């Protein structure tokens, strides 16, 4: 099996027995253990924002080629996995909390819609997850990417569904941001998150040749151990079907719920008329009647269950910004599971440890094979993608910088809006230029969409009055960070907010930043040949 994105196809054998076959090598790929998890981004994206009204999948999508009618107590894969409750859903799949009888633990089970293009997309995702699994164990970044534990094909009345089994993680970073009232997460906690994400990105980019393409707070999950999961009670409503509810889109929706997945090209899956007849005559036992939908029952705040994330922060990890980051209702405490970091006025203070993992690789691609140019969620979208220029792994570092700013301040770094005489794209590029002040006009004019945004002189076509506001000044004037801390943050983020993707600093190099020294693993250091992506193939453009 190569790492170039050539597709796998699920081969359905006898009922109840399936295997995924690599048609390139004709080898059976055994059910994987330990890869990644696209599921929880969908799961936790909803769980973290329970305050916002949740909606369910459309009952009309339960048909041949659509969702599998999962029911509580249903058994999957030779009775190994038993469904306990519904965690979430997306246009791509539904996600369920299940008990793994073999491993004696709870897992997240994602059941993909059975239509051919959804199956093909899931096979692409599995290939990417396998590449991540097979990478160098010595690279610590691997531990900060979610793990796929198993995969198989499940046959039901609506067709053959690719299923993926993931480790269950806690809530995502959006939940963390909200728990601090959008006023900023303590700096000591942000530093830990930043370091872990950077080494994870270096592992993806340098070791695996993979670009995430959709980094955002919703797709970074906080780890939670199995002991906490053992005490999660099943809600009383999980077995009660309900009709489809509101379909309004809100910020809490993540990769799956915010938009349909990007459809990738791959080898077609056999979807014969005979298979359709077989399922019509022999539907799965106890399957739900058409038109009924089990309501999602995501976890209540897992932050409160995570041992190192309980209690209040009081005055830890505030680093010169006590007023900015003082939150009496914070979910963190300074227990035994903590770090001692430099605090205010040179003092040393305990900061709770936090471990995060990158999730949702459903839109990921290879550095040598981009599936689409429609990548990145709006607020985390890089200028090269907006302009329609060539892009590469460095686009992830732009998104990373936007996430760190949001963690520190509680606000988006860029939040473009439509105007009477300009588009969101106009406003987005204008906001970027206002922050960076300078930009390469040659690049600005080189994209597929450049003529819509710039005139021949490289000036914005539809927005003429700009208010330049460099990052350090934004942090100091708007968010009241001290001048020293604002400078430190600006020095850390600015190299990854370079307009030109080829000159953007790579993740491995930034993991060695002095700003992260106190949270970095002293036994692990990423050696790079330069600050930018000289030694990262596909850094700024697709490898051809």
Curated annotation (Swiss-Prot):
Q: Which InterPro entries match?
A: Kinase-like_dom_sf, Prot_kinase_dom, Protein_kinase_ATP_BS, Ser/Thr_kinase_AS, SRPK
* Active site, UniProt feature: 214
| Any GO MF annotation of the entry | protein serine kinase activity
Q: GO CC terms on record?
A: cell division site; cytoplasm; cytosol; mitotic spindle pole body; nucleus; spliceosomal complex
- Chain spans, region Disordered: 235-299, 316-341
Q: Where does ATP bind?
A: 87-95, 110
Q: Where in the cell is it found?
A: Cytoplasm; Nucleus
The catalytic activity of this protein is classed by the Enzyme Commission as: 2.7.11.1
Tell me what reaction this enzyme catalyses: L-seryl-[protein] + ATP = O-phospho-L-seryl-[protein] + ADP + H(+); L-threonyl-[protein] + ATP = O-phospho-L-threonyl-[protein] + ADP + H(+)
Q: Which PANTHER family match?
A: PROTEIN KINASE DOMAIN-CONTAINING PROTEIN-RELATED
- What protein name is recorded for this chain? Protein kinase dsk1
């Amino acid at each position: 099996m190569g790492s170039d994105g050539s597709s796998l196809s699920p081969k359905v054998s006898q009922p109840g027995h399936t295997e995924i076959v690599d048609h390139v090598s004709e080898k059976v790929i055994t059910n994987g253990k330990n890869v990644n998890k696209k599921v929880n981004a969908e799961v936790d994206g909803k769980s973290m924002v329970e305050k916002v009204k949740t909606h369910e999948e459309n009952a009309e999508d339960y048909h041949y080629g659509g969702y599998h009618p999962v029911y509580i107590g249903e058994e999957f894969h030779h009775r190994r996995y038993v469904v306990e409750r519904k965690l979430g859903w997306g246009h791509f799949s539904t996600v369920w909390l299940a008990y793994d009888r073999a491993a004696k633990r709870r897992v997240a089970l994602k059941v993909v819609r059975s239509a051919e293009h959804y199956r093909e997309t899931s096979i692409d995702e599995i290939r990417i997850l396998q590449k991540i699994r097979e990478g160098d164990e010595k690279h610590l970044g691997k531990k900060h990417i979610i793990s796929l534990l198993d995969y198989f094909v499940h046959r039901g009345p609506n067709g053959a569904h690719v299923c993926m089994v993931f480790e269950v993680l806690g809530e995502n970073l959006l939940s963390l941001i909200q728990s601090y009232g959008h006023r900023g997460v303590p700096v000591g906690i942000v530093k830990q998150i930043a370091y872990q994400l950077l080494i994870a990105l270096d592992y993806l980019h340098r070791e695996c040749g993979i670009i995430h393409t959709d980094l955002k707070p919703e797709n970074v999950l906080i780890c939670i151990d199995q002991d906490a999961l053992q005490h999660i009670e099943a809600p009383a409503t999980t077995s009660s079907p309900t009709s489809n509810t509101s379909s309004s889109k809100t910020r809490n929706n993540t990769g799956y719920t915010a938009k349909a997945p990007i459809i990738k090209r791959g080898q077609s899956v056999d979807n014969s008329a005979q298979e359709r007849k077989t399922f019509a005559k022999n539907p799965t036992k106890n399957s739900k009647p058409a038109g009924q939908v089990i309501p999602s029952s995501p976890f209540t705040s897992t932050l409160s269950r995570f041992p190192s994330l309980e209690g209040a922060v009081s005055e830890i990890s505030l680093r010169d910004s006590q007023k900015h980051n003082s939150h009496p209702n914070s979910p963190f405490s300074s227990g035994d599971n903590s770090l001692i970091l430099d605090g205010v006025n040179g003092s040393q203070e305990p900061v709770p440890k936090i471990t995060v993992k990158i999730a949702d690789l459903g839109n990921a691609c290879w550095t040598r094979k981009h599936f689409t140019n429609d990548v990145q969620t709006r607020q985390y979208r890089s200028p090269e993608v907006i302009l329609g220029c060539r892009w590469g792994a460095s686009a992830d570092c732009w998104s990373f910088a936007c996430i760190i700013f949001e963690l520190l301040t509680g606000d988006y770094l860029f939040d473009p809006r439509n105007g009477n005489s300009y588009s969101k794209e106009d406003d987005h590029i204008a906001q970027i230029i206002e922050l960076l002040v300078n930009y390469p006009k040659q690049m600005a004019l080189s994209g597929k969409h450049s003529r819509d945004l710039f005139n021949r002189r490289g000036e914005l076509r539809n927005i003429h009055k700009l208010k330049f506001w460099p990052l350090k000044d934004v942090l100091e004037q708007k968010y009241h960070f001290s001048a020293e801390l604002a400078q430190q943050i600006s020095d850390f983020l600015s190299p990854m907010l370079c307009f030109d993707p080829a000159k953007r600093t790579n993740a491995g190099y930034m993991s060695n930043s002095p700003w992260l020294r106190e949270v970095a693993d002293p036994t692990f250091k990423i050696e790079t040949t330069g600050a930018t992506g000289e030694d990262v193939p596909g850094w700024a453009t697709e490898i051809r």
